Amino acid sequence: MIRTKNIFLIGPVGAGKSTIGKQLAKQLKLEFIDSDDTIEKKCGVDINWIFDLEGEEGFRKRERDVIAEILAEKQNIVLATGGGAILDPDTRSLLSSRGKVVYLEATIEQQLERTAKDTKRPLLRVDDKKPVLEQLMAEREPLYRSIADVVVETNGATVKNIVNKISTFLVEETIL
């Protein structure tokens, strides 16, 4: 049996999924894919526009379909998912059955700092982001943990240190 090396990064907005994913893929010599970028390319519009037109439910359906399509076509990838991808039970099942799931944990303070000037996140287009982030975390944290093969805290760690922690885990799990 040929072992696939799919690595899925999940976690809240501002956890560093895309930044860490790019470096992890480079280190492991795997292809990096960002599901949000893929959705935007496929639809020809940005995520805010999709949310405005179709709502969160419409976006989550597109997200689920794009992730399923990526996994049907690609192997040996590092995939950074959107923060809410785990809300869909089919997406959770697909991720947990097709590779190793790495939950990048971030505090609310870290998320606030990293998203302070960000206008690309539809759920954070509000003046006071903290209560929104707290609500999202309360809703999503149990789902992140339910499918995570490993939890990596990102607070105060460098990208290099986080990538090394993930790589060490993958070696121990004999995926590398």
From Swiss-Prot:
EC number per UniProt: 2.7.1.71
GO terms, molecular function: ATP binding; magnesium ion binding; shikimate kinase activity
SUPFAM superfamilies the UniProt entry points to: P-loop containing nucleoside triphosphate hydrolases
Positions contributing to substrate binding: 36, 60, 83, 140
Signal sequence segment: none
Cofactors, names only: Mg(2+)
Record key words, sorted: Amino-acid biosynthesis, Aromatic amino acid biosynthesis, ATP-binding, Cytoplasm, Kinase, Magnesium, Metal-binding, Nucleotide-binding, Transferase
Pfam families with a match to the protein in the record: SKI
Cofactor binding note: Binds 1 Mg(2+) ion per subunit.
Predominant location: cytoplasm
Chemical reaction(s) catalysed: shikimate + ATP = 3-phosphoshikimate + ADP + H(+)
KW Acyltransferase (keyword) present: no
Compartments where located: Cytoplasm
Major enzyme class: transferase
Gene3D superfamilies listed in its UniProt record: P-loop containing nucleotide triphosphate hydrolases (3.40.50.300)
Transmembrane segments: none
Cellular compartments per GO CC: cytosol
Pathway(s) this gene product operates in, as recorded in its UniProt entry: Metabolic intermediate biosynthesis; chorismate biosynthesis; chorismate from D-erythrose 4-phosphate and phosphoenolpyruvate: step 5/7
Entry keyword annotation includes Ion transport: no
Top-rank taxon, per record: Bacteria
Homology family: Belongs to the shikimate kinase family.
Quaternary context: Monomer.
Function: Catalyzes the specific phosphorylation of the 3-hydroxyl group of shikimic acid using ATP as a cosubstrate.
Name assigned to this protein: Shikimate kinase
Species name: Francisella philomiragia subsp. philomiragia (strain ATCC 25017 / CCUG 19701 / FSC 153 / O#319-036)
Gene label: aroK
